[in-house]
Curated annotation (Swiss-Prot):
Gene this chain is encoded by: nrdR
Zinc finger map (unnamed): 3-34
GO annotation, biological process: negative regulation of DNA-templated transcription
Molecular function terms, GO-annotated: ATP binding; DNA binding; zinc ion binding
Organism, as annotated: Synechococcus sp. (strain CC9902)
Protein name: Transcriptional repressor NrdR
Amino acid sequence: MQCPSCQNTDSRVLESRAADGGRSVRRRRECLNCDFRFTTYERVETVPITVIKRDGCRELFNRTKVLHGLSRACDKTGLDAARLETVVENLELQLQQRTAKEVASSEIGELVLKELKQISEVAYIRFASVYRQFRGIDDFVSTLETMNTEQEHLAAVR
């Protein structure tokens, strides 16, 4: 590993531990040339996910875009950035576990909605209104009624 201070490639590992819930290894290193200490992270290389947009064009999955959409939907709901980061990490993990490395943007939207429904109804409605392109109040009412029916069903089952 190249030292960020002197660019020497000889270093020794002082400490290693799991990070990101076991998805990476954090290593504390010391340069053998200048004694500079630095941290590196080792992660499994993932296969890029290709997103098929509504218009048929393809682009690489961009976690920043998903996080931005979540942030807008969750603005002023009390959900912190760490929780949103966890939602995006869970989404990425689900996508990486699939055998197909192409996914429709609609599938990503539905996975995000599924996560949001569990953590914030307000964020769910806000995200759904953009993602599902609500045209008027009837779309909001319909979604709220569906959510209410689902909650009543869950309460009856318990």
